């Protein structure tokens, strides 16, 4: 229980020191800038929950003075708005990187470890290395700089919100291509999430090559298949 109270206390401390003259979602970055960190990164992912397709991690690096007022958590924006902001973000930020981890590695590692793997790959791909990194309720091993881990960071950090938009737009494009490669599952619409129509397609067609075998109901499908093969 003490750990939970410590986290609440830390978040409360951050909130108390916010500058009302700054945009709310730039407060954390500005605290880091004020502490001497000149290159601050935010990371976010898309695709942890779906039963099909990859998990995509994005990292965005910013310097003081970089800001786009319209940027928000990607889930709060329309597809059209995300795509518009995508172009603005990649043209304005100091550096950015995206890593894609497919279903096979997700099944091998588990989704949590696969997500961390994607973040590490994105971090390693950056041309400009950040001095501080903000993530949503996650910490990475091997990063020597300052790390800030906060729940719902995509709602209160500009850099993380930028990363959430990049990850979401790129993953959506991947799923739209998969909709053409594997028709019948509705990937363009459901993006791999288990909607009623998606479940019905699974019952009719069986899993596709991009379905995650470690996720239900696909896991049970392959379990039943093994039992059938033994009979």
Swiss-Prot record:
Gene3D superfamilies associated with the record: Ribonuclease H-like superfamily/Ribonuclease H
Reaction equation(s) it catalyzes: Endonucleolytic cleavage to 5'-phosphomonoester
BP GO terms, sorted: DNA replication, removal of RNA primer; mismatch repair
Cross-referenced PROSITE patterns: RNASE_H_2
Entry-linked SUPFAM superfamilies: Ribonuclease H-like
This protein's UniProt keywords: Cytoplasm, Endonuclease, Hydrolase, Manganese, Metal-binding, Nuclease
Annotated Gene Ontology cellular component terms: cytoplasm; ribonuclease H2 complex
All copies of domain RNase H type-2, residue ranges: 38-227
Annotated Pfam families: RNase_HII
Cofactor binding, per record: Manganese or magnesium. Binds 1 divalent metal ion per monomer in the absence of substrate. May bind a second metal ion after substrate binding.
Subcellular localization, as worded in the UniProt entry: Cytoplasm
Cofactor(s) listed in the protein's UniProt record: Mn(2+); Mg(2+)
Function: Endonuclease that specifically degrades the RNA of RNA-DNA hybrids.
PANTHER family according to UniProt: RIBONUCLEASE H2 SUBUNIT A, RIBONUCLEASE HII
Protein name per UniProt: Ribonuclease HII
Organism annotation: Carboxydothermus hydrogenoformans (strain ATCC BAA-161 / DSM 6008 / Z-2901)
